[in-house]
Amino acid sequence: MSALVCVARIGAAHGVRGAVKLWTFTEDPFAIKRYGPLLSKDGKRQFEVAQAREAKDHLVATFKGVTTRDEAERLNGIELYVAREKLPATDEDEYYHTDLIGLAAVTTDGEPLGRVLAIHNFGAGDIIEIAPPKGASLLLPFSNAVVPEVDVAGGRVVVALPQEIAGDEAEER
């Protein structure tokens, strides 16, 4: 089996007929219906979306076989996964977060910075979190100016540290 990629998280029950709040991590929230059965993290449980409708910042969905509020409440917090090969190919300069996490981060001079820990989006654009070998994580804009090169096959991202951060590092040395 190929690597699994998290595409959604089940939230609280919604109503009394087995519906749940569903937060999707896909560009098109309704894409999760096209991936076929979704899997639990361990791959042992399958979930098939029966219906989904848009809500404020999530979907309200029902799964086949889940018909009561009690059943829906037991699903709260479960992350849903699909096999990596079921996801569509990315365009140039587009990446799945899962492909970036764990890559080595180096400066434009080739100096090691650490590893990509996560990609966040707090509403104003993507942020790349880099965990250095010691010290606090670096949170940087994930833009072409700050991350001019992403080499997934080579296992690294190149980071052009903003002057404020580069200057802070120079003072610490």
Swiss-Prot record:
Domain PRC barrel: 92-165
Family: Belongs to the RimM family.
Alphabetized GO MF terms: ribosome binding
GO CC annotations on file: cytosol; ribosome
Free-text domain note: The PRC barrel domain binds ribosomal protein uS19.
Cell compartments where the protein resides: Cytoplasm
Physiological role: An accessory protein needed during the final step in the assembly of 30S ribosomal subunit, possibly for assembly of the head region. Essential for efficient processing of 16S rRNA. May be needed both before and after RbfA during the maturation of 16S rRNA. It has affinity for free ribosomal 30S subunits but not for 70S ribosomes.
Subunit structure and binding partners: Binds ribosomal protein uS19.
Sorted UniProt keywords: Chaperone, Cytoplasm, Ribosome biogenesis, rRNA processing
Domain of life: Bacteria
Source species: Bradyrhizobium diazoefficiens (strain JCM 10833 / BCRC 13528 / IAM 13628 / NBRC 14792 / USDA 110)
An individual GO BP term: maturation of SSU-rRNA
Protein name: Ribosome maturation factor RimM
Predominant subcellular localization, coarse grouping: cytoplasm
